[in-house]
Amino acid sequence: MAQLDTQKIISTIANSKKTTPVKVYLKGKLSELHFPKSVHAFIGKHTGTVIGDWAEIKPILKKAKLDDYYVETAGRNTGVPLLDIKAANARIEPGAIIRDQVLIGDNAVIMMGAIINIGAEIGAGTMIDMGAVLGGRAIVGKHCHIGAGTVLAGVVEPPSAKPVTIGDHVMIGANAVVLEGTTVGEGAVIAAGAVVINDVPAHTVVAGVPAKVIKQVNDQTEAKTVLLDELRKL
């Protein structure tokens, strides 16, 4: 997968309009309320809901004569929206947080609580397990498994920094940490809880803190770390 342009990512964060996205539930006489087109307004006779930027909604509410209203705030001065996942050809479970400018390959699986930062790339058929974190610009190849609670460190700044790169067919156990600038070779296995600070050769098994090569991947290793295509069907 091609790495996303670093300068474009930085420009997006720096120059995007900062907003405070809210959802507001209204009760009262609502017929006289008028919101700008940028606000999604679903108004009935006595109750309604509006969704938009608090900076646009707040002045209108201050002038309105309402019986009550309640505000749900999704963020404050946010610069990067969440990715629109409706068109993704992947399985994305509720509770995953995926920012814009993330690339997701076909039949990838992103489990509950996973956090995927801007510029990250996930290859086809790769599973990102529960609570895993992919930092900015982290690259994961095809048909990998990134274990629950694992962290792939991100690098958005400095822009010249090398991102974490995970090759195809890599298995990473739960709660491992892969530091920025590290490359993990194709078919490698990283044990649960390992902290990877150096590049991992292809088809090796690493474990420990810091992670060290303990053996080559063999038939026994492959049997224990086999990935199931059945879990990646849509």
From Swiss-Prot:
GO biological process: diaminopimelate biosynthetic process; lysine biosynthetic process via diaminopimelate
EC number(s) per entry: 2.3.1.89
Disulfide bonds: none
Class of this enzyme: transferase
Annotated catalysed reactions: (S)-2,3,4,5-tetrahydrodipicolinate + acetyl-CoA + H2O = L-2-acetamido-6-oxoheptanedioate + CoA
Transmembrane spans: none
InterPro entries: DapH, DapH_N, Hexapep, Trans_hexapeptide_repeat, Trimer_LpxA-like_sf
An annotated Gene Ontology molecular function: tetrahydrodipicolinate N-acetyltransferase activity
Pathway where it operates: Amino-acid biosynthesis; L-lysine biosynthesis via DAP pathway; LL-2,6-diaminopimelate from (S)-tetrahydrodipicolinate (acetylase route): step 1/3
Keyword hit for DNA repair: no
Keyword terms of this UniProt record: Acyltransferase, Amino-acid biosynthesis, Diaminopimelate biosynthesis, Lysine biosynthesis, Repeat, Transferase
Keyword Transmembrane helix appears in the UniProt entry: no
A Pfam family hit: Hexapep
PANTHER family: 2,3,4,5-TETRAHYDROPYRIDINE-2,6-DICARBOXYLATE N-ACETYLTRANSFERASE (PTHR43300:SF10), ACETYLTRANSFERASE (PTHR43300)
Described function: Catalyzes the transfer of an acetyl group from acetyl-CoA to tetrahydrodipicolinate.
Family: Belongs to the transferase hexapeptide repeat family. DapH subfamily.
Protein name: 2,3,4,5-tetrahydropyridine-2,6-dicarboxylate N-acetyltransferase
Organism field: Lacticaseibacillus casei (strain BL23)
Highest classification ranks of the organism: Bacteria, Bacillati, Bacillota, Bacilli, Lactobacillales
